[in-house]
């Protein structure tokens, strides 16, 4: 299957790389290297530079060319590279004409700061493509056999972070009264207060 879809993607990436560099935000999926989308894998296969998170499966880096530059900008609780530093790395390499893949755990727009990276790139006139990833908000319940919605049960679901937002806690009591299924991401540390 890769041969069928690979050639047009490589040609398009080559045409872009010959002029101004670009950035592709690729959602790596929920953890396993086999859970990235085909389009995400194809973007990695044509990357000059891969800027990756700590949450992305390390095996995904094998999908990039051996001569690609790999830059880990992984964040851990309380430490790591700042968002401004990540933005600067993306701008620097794209401005130099490189084809940059920004590999992000899960989906770039589900607590992934993808919009901040796009805004920083746009401020420098750099185009950006987004390739969605499978979010753990959907994958974890599915892999555990837990339906987020079902006939006669929950008709909706809510995804939220377990962390405080703007120094305010969620109204957990109100959320608990809802008939909606709740999916709490990044909830391990604050679990005792949820």
Regions found by a protein language model. Give the residues of each.
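Beta-strand/loop-alpha-helix module characteristic of Rossmann-like adenine-cofactor folds
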Residues: 2-23, 100, 119, 126-129, ...
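Class I S-adenosyl-L-methionine
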Residues: 1-33, 38-131, 139
